[in-house]
Amino acid sequence: MSRHLETSLNNKEFVLNSLEKGLRLDGRQLSDFRSLEIQFGKEYGQVDVSFGHTRVMARITTEITKPYTDRPFDGIFSITTELTPLAYSAFEAGRVSDQEIVISRLIEKAVRRSNALDTESLCIISGQKCWHVRASVHFINHDGNLVDAACIAVIAALCHFRRPELTVVGEEVTVHPVEERVPVPLSILHMPICVTFSFFNNGELAIVDATLEEEDLCNGSMTITLNKNREVCQIYKAGGIIIDPSKIISCAKTAFDIAVSVCSVIQQALDEDLRKKETQYLGGSAENERS
């Protein structure tokens, strides 16, 4: 079984002393997020997110199924994550780790419980048929802050995804291929963004977007999920350290600035990809007309 290698005492002392002086190994300030890159695939709902050496891919798929009996007017949203040795040698293949469970629950709460995805719009026939939206998250490389990376990937993929158009006559549902009718975007009401803080010196020092080495040395962490409208969706704290309420408020203010910036990057990437796809679609249509 592959085990995680602990940081040496010299490296630990160097990193902690640097953080106390407001310095980080990659040159960032304590409240700086790494440069975010978002690339969409050829199909709707495929996205590749990376910052630093952390890289995550997400894919959205849908199928028509029966809604839950206690929610006959709602569709279904689910998320699956996959942590394998491909991303980090300490992860075990075929085994669901506690970290994987935490990530799945945090993202599921961020999307579904905050009503970011309008599940009522996924209803086709009440109590009989609805859309089941699945988000599959694959971690390609782990250099810290997997929660934030997974959240950004899922939100970007949901905003990018298009489902087939439907025609409903009575209880008969017809699914139109994308070649026949323009696919329909999901109803996304807002973009919840996870921002994770790592704490040192028993909670007195907080940093944003920790690298893997910084995560190994921290006393605990806290993830704040919020959107650009200053609405806090959830707060999750890992670790037994006590965090002063004033520190939480300070972190929330920092998280808001980061969330606004991340939403802007996501929207810009979406707009650019949409323009590319429209150009390809129009070019393909013109080619078909000439032939």
Swiss-Prot record:
Its main location: cytoplasm. It is found in: Cytoplasm; Nucleus, Nucleolus. GO terms for biological process: exonucleolytic trimming to generate mature 3'-end of 5.8S rRNA from tricistronic rRNA transcript (SSU-rRNA, 5.8S rRNA, LSU-rRNA); nonfunctional rRNA decay; nuclear mRNA surveillance; nuclear polyadenylation-dependent mRNA catabolic process; nuclear polyadenylation-dependent rRNA catabolic process; nuclear-transcribed mRNA catabolic process, 3'-5' exonucleolytic nonsense-mediated decay; nuclear-transcribed mRNA catabolic process, non-stop decay; rRNA catabolic process. The keyword Hydrolase does not apply. GO terms for molecular function: 3'-5'-RNA exonuclease activity; mRNA 3'-UTR AU-rich region binding. The keyword Transmembrane helix does not apply. Keywords: Cytoplasm, Exosome, Nucleus, RNA-binding, rRNA processing. GO terms for cellular component: cytoplasmic exosome (RNase complex); cytosol; exosome (RNase complex); nuclear exosome (RNase complex); nucleolus; nucleus. Component of the RNA exosome complex. Specifically part of the catalytically inactive RNA exosome core complex (Exo-9) which may associate with the catalytic subunits rrp6 and dis3 in cytoplasmic- and nuclear-specific RNA exosome complex forms. Exo-9 is formed by a hexameric base ring of RNase PH domain-containing subunits and a cap ring consisting of csl4, rrp4 and rrp40. Belongs to the RNase PH family. Non-catalytic component of the RNA exosome complex which has 3'->5' exoribonuclease activity and participates in a multitude of cellular RNA processing and degradation events. In the nucleus, the RNA exosome complex is involved in proper maturation of stable RNA species such as rRNA, snRNA and snoRNA, in the elimination of RNA processing by-products and non-coding 'pervasive' transcripts, such as antisense RNA species and cryptic unstable transcripts (CUTs), and of mRNAs with processing defects, thereby limiting or excluding their export to the cytoplasm. This is Exosome complex component rrp45. It comes from Schizosaccharomyces pombe (strain 972 / ATCC 24843).
